[in-house]
Amino acid sequence: MRKFWVALSSIEEIDSSFIQRLFNYFGDIESVFNASDLSGIEGLSVKKAENFLRLRDRVDVDKVYQAVVDRGINFLTFDDGNYPLMLRNIDDPPSVIYYKGNLSDCNFDRTLAVVGSRRATSYAREALSQIISELNGTDICIVSGLASGIDTTAHVSALDNNLKTIGVIASGFDYTYPAANKELYKRIEDGSGAVLTEYYPTFQPIKFRFPQRNRIVSGLSYGTLVAEASLKSGALITANLTLEQGRELMCIPGLITN
């Protein structure tokens, strides 16, 4: 059954919400992959149904599944009992979570998302580092997006203080973005935490995927800490998602001179 989830997630032209819609209708993922008639799905146009069937029938299930295995990538599917409950309960949960590292080491009852500017000020970085250092000795897991700036500070501070950390990336594992964080990826994967993504390994870090991944950052977490953000930033997108998901939202006060 797991390979059918992977096969569907390998189709770039569809997203998790569409896969979930089909899964909810048919009741199991193998039926989704083998279905020939989608006419009973309310609101699904004939054109979209035909396009999906055409794309699906091109997929070599065993080949795309084996490509994940050969890369040493672990994964959880939406119907897996180990799929994080907090993430399952959001409006648009990822159909598959691909990951490297030790996801099972993370306490999903003690998760804190950290978001902020890629061009963070020294004040924001220092304030965040101090806050995270005071969590040393707890089992809190820091969740962020492995971008430059605040994300990097959050992950490094977590690791330096013996905390678990999860990096949620906006591409498949064939890509490292930003390239400057290659060693940080490895440090997380080899240490106390995991790097994860909803994207099949070959999917590139395209611009629209960055705001998409933000729902996972907040969705994995009981609360979100905004360290620093501009008015139209991805950090504020995550902040809004946090409120929509009914989670706690916190922020580091800015300098009164800023």
State the predicted function of each range.
Residues 1-134:
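Short, positively charged patches
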Residues 78-258:
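Glycine-biased, small-residue-rich flexible motifs in mid-sequence functional cores and linkers
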